[in-house]
Structures are given as C-alpha cells and as structure tokens.
C-alpha cells in the first residue's frame, strides 16, 4: 500500500507502507484553528478516536486515497 504521510494539509508525500499496514488514514482536529495539526499515514486498521471526539478520522484501502 502507498499512503501519504505528510502532516501538512495540501502537501502530498507518498510512502510505501510496512507489510501488514494496508489502511491509509488521516486524523484532522475538529477545531478549525488546529486543522494544520493533522496526521496522515499507514495503519493495520482504522485508528479510533478517544472517549472525547476531537478528531475527524478518515480511512481507505487504496493507494494514495487520502
């Protein structure tokens, strides 16, 4: 799988994911002034938000999908 791992919105830096990490994800803070703190990368499954929902989490299973 190839996923973007840039933490900067609108910047794409594709990376080859390690074996077993077949999900691309993006975690973006819900509070708009912190959107630049997003995190993108590879995972073995879609990450979950904690008890207090502070992130919008998107996941997909195709190359460069987020």
UniProtKB/Swiss-Prot annotation:
A Pfam family that the UniProt record links to this protein: Toxin_cobra-type
Swiss-Prot/TrEMBL keywords: Disulfide bond, Secreted
Subcellular location: Secreted
Predominant localisation class: secreted
GO cellular component: extracellular region
Regions crossing the membrane: none
Domain of life: Eukaryota
InterPro entries: Snake_3FTx (IPR003571), Snake_toxin-like_sf (IPR045860), Toxin_cobra-type (IPR054131)
S-S bonds: 3-24, 17-42, 46-59, 60-65
Protein's UniProt keywords contain Transport: no
Tissue: Expressed by the venom gland.
GO MF annotation: an example: toxin activity
Protein family membership: Belongs to the three-finger toxin family. Short-chain subfamily.
Function of the molecule: No toxicity is observed upon intravenous or intracerebroventricular injection into mice. Has no cytotoxic activity towards C2C12 cells at 100 ug/ml.
Protein name: Clarkitoxin-I-Mdum
């Amino acid at each position: 799988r190839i996923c973007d791992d840039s933490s900067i919105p609108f910047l794409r830096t594709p990376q080859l994911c390690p074996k077993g990490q077949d999900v691309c994800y993006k975690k973006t803070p819900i509070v708009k002034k912190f959107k630049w703190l997003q995190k993108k990368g590879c995972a073995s499954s879609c990450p979950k938000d904690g008890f207090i929902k502070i992130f919008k989490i998107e996941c997909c299973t195709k190359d460069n999908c987020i």
